[in-house]
């Protein structure tokens, strides 16, 4: 591996933040050797921009199908990624894929909750479990002391809406109960992982990208995807063991749980 370059996997890369992460990463925002870009249907029309990036950077980008709501798909992806990265392991896993439901409590069904949890919490949980061996391989083979994304890290994209302390400030304009509850659970999952795998020197952190103008965020967002992603990349690059278990916004401000 070239000095300073890392092996990265990003989920949900066919559009929005995930696609912008791939675009900026291959442009050098984070030095990368292998970039595994995952999405549910990489051959479909919604992934044309991703396919174009893959064709432009065939030595760096590997596009791998992944449905994070399907454990079999996650296991198959882990096998393929293991073959791609080999003995170097995986330095950075970005749990970006997610779905949204804007319903208030009285309009939220049990099925709504199950659907959001299956993708937004069980997906990241299974990604951590199945890719842990590759993350451990990267951590164990690294000569870097302490924690960083250049060693081994999992960064999950969360949301201010998952903050319990901020509900009264944000609920009136955006109830989204199933989404809020799933992101709150993701925050707890990440904090547990940060504690459990501290001994392995694998960094776990949560980032809120801001209200971004994407398909999910809508046109009324306050920030464009390139700016959000670049600032998140800058944060990722500066992370150390003191950020293990942290919950930050894209500007580096700590978000209350």
Question: What feature does the model see in each segment?
Answer:
Residues 14, 18-23:
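N-terminal Rossmann NAD(P)H-binding glycine-rich loop of SDR-like oxidoreductase domains
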Residues 26-47:
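Conserved glycine-rich Rossmann-like NAD(P)H-binding loop of the short-chain dehydrogenase/reductase
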Residues 53-72:
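Rossmann-fold cofactor-recognition segment
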Residues 69-88:
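Conserved Rossmann-fold cofactor-binding substructure of NAD(P)-dependent oxidoreductases
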Residues 73-76, 123-130:
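Conserved mid-core alpha-helix of short-chain dehydrogenase/reductase
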Residues 199, 206-209, 214, 218-257:
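C-terminal helical subdomain
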